A protein has these predicted regions:
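Alpha-helical residues within the helix-turn-helix
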Residues: 48, 65-66
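Single conserved hydrophobic/aromatic residue that forms the stacking wall/gate
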Residues: 1-8, 12
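Short, cationic-aromatic polyanion-contact patches
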Residues: 21-25, 42, 75-97
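Extended, solvent-exposed segments with strong compositional bias
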Residues: 141-153, 211-267, 283
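A short beta-strand element within beta-rich, extracytoplasmic domains
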Residues: 173-192
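Amphipathic alpha-helical dimerization/coiled-coil segments
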Residues: 90-154, 158
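Short beta-strands within extracellular/lumenal beta-sheet-rich domains
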Residues: 151-172, 255-259
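Short coil-to-beta strand junction motifs in C2/discoidin
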Residues: 191-202
Length: 312
């Protein structure tokens, strides 16, 4: 669905202003640092660490919560009713460049199990929100009919490939593709320090590689279901892959000079996105892809396609 830029732009400006205001305080920066180090803390613990009163802390927490940086919840498991604070955002990306063709965007989501091609090697497996699909470390189950419902998959090397839906209007060319997905490495068990070189391909052309730092299991993922094993991958990092006329970027950092113009894509084009851990990579550390029922972000693989009229 096309997004009209004027109203959306005003909303984004207001959101950005609130975030900058929230970060304009040494105390609030210290709160963020403490929550990064400790994952979660109650109000009493934070106030003691910061040497301020609970009343003063409440005002700071409200500002951080209002712009989505911090979440609060009530925990009545201990003595009394404690308010627990956790960090909601792990990154803030500031894009000072005006969005290109922002009024013409097609958005879609791909479930983790909707791959159209794969070649994977153990350790590997996949699961829906409620159960494992078949047995782990048996690649045959990547062809099981239930795999379309998969919300998480993992493998030590190989690839999965997705067909990107292209339903932009006729007589339009593609000017940018943005992919957003929660990813991590795949270690035997869990290991927060387990680098893996994950390469991204568009229509069989490598557009760049990102090194995942680890396979994270120190705390349970926010959306990871209760039945999931505690010593298995719990959450990943939300990565934003963008290819446009300037190159290919991960989280705003350029990873290659491959541009969208190299593909000459329009409303008739088919597009395939491959995520791979290659045999010849420096770090062959596997790949885990998290869907909306696992990890920390509650989303599937999101795709945004910017388009503009084809010039005659």
């Amino acid at each position: 669905t096309p997004i009209k830029s004027s109203a959306a732009s005003d909303v984004y400006k207001r959101q950005g202003l609130d975030i900058f205001k929230a970060l304009g305080s040494d105390v609030r920066i210290e709160i963020i640092k403490l929550l990064i180090e400790n994952k979660e803390m109650n109000m009493n613990e934070l106030a003691a660490k910061l040497n301020i009163t609970n009343g003063a802390l409440t005002g700071h927490i409200k500002k951080l919560e209002a712009c989505g940086i911090v979440n609060t919840s009530n925990d009545s498991s201990g003595h009394g009713n404690q308010k627990i604070c956790t960090l909601h955002l792990d990154k803030i990306l500031i894009d000072l460049d005006a969005p290109e063709e922002a009024q013409n965007v097609y958005n879609a989501e791909l479930q983790v199990g909707h791959y159209c091609n794969y070649e994977v090697y153990p350790t590997c497996g996949l699961a829906t929100a409620s159960h494992l699909i078949g047995e782990v470390d048996d690649t045959r189950y990547f062809a099981h009919p239930d795999r379309y419902n998969a919300d998480i998959l993992w493998f030590s090397k190989g690839f999965v490939e997705y067909e990107i839906p292209n339903f932009i209007p006729g007589s339009q060319k593609i000017t940018q593709i943005l992919i957003s997905a929660e990813l991590s490495s795949e270690a035997p068990g869990i290991n927060n320090v387990w680098p893996s070189d994950i390469s991204f391909y568009l229509n069989d052309v490598c557009i760049g590689t990102w090194t995942s730092p680890g396979d994270f299991g120190d705390v349970r993922g926010i959306f990871t279901p209760d039945w999931w094993f505690p010593n298995w991958n719990q959450y990943g990092l939300l990565k934003m892959l963008v290819i446009n006329k300037k190159g290919t970027f991960i989280d705003g950092l350029q990873i290659s000079d491959v541009t969208i113009r190299d593909f000459n894509l329009d409303y008739r084009s088919s597009m395939k996105l491959r995520m791979a851990v290659n045999d010849n990579a420096e770090h062959v550390g596997g790949l885990t892809i998290f869907g909306k029922s696992f990890g920390n972000y509650g989303q599937d693989i999101k795709v945004s396609i910017n388009y503009a009229p084809i010039e005659e």
